Amino acid sequence: MPAQHVNKIIDTLVYNETMILYVSATQGEAAQVPSDYPLIVTGIGIIRATLALTEYLARADELPERIINFGTAGSLSGNTGIFEIDHVFQHDFDHKVIEQIIGKPFPNGIDLPTVSTLPTAHLATGDSFINDPDTRARLAQQAQLCDMEGYAIAFVAQHFGIPCTLIKQVSDNADDAAADTWVDAVDRGAQDLAGAIRTLNQRLNRL
């Protein structure tokens, strides 16, 4: 997203009780989130998500106590509903080749401690909208859901030492109808996502 848009959001942020920063990729996904929740809308994709969140955290006078990324995800296994992610990785980055080149481990995956009562899932993140059966089948061997920002958000949060939670709602089946399904699902699912976010916020405030 344009840097000036991020700066404007930064200037107007007001933290809630437990200093949670909420992050979504699009305005549509965040449409029903309460207006007093501190929110960054990053734009779609790994690069935009990384840039927007890093810029905010680097400039913040005080870091949030937790980052919650929420939004839609494609289903790789036919599941539906809202999930909390317990493991996320970047599916379009071949870390094994890098390991061979440098001769040492090059991790590509982050385990995330869960904090909600939602069902859990593994998430595959990449800079491509999954809508073909071959890619879907390949990713389904490692994850139940796929998106385009989750790993970037978790990676930046880890770098800054901030606990991170990923909440994802299934919007499509990552097949040849995914693009059309996603557009409809964003509007329909915004209310459900907002409800899950409010419930999680209340739970974290009681901890």
Region annotations inferred by a language model:
Residues N16-L21:
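Extreme N-terminal starter segment of soluble prokaryotic enzymes
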Residues H5:
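Cationic, low-complexity basic patches in intrinsically disordered or flexible, solvent-exposed regions
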Residues T26-L207:
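Glycine-rich phosphate- or other oxyanion-binding loops that anchor nucleotides, phosphorylated ligands
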Residues I9-Y15:
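Short, positively charged and aromatic/hydrophobic N-terminal segments
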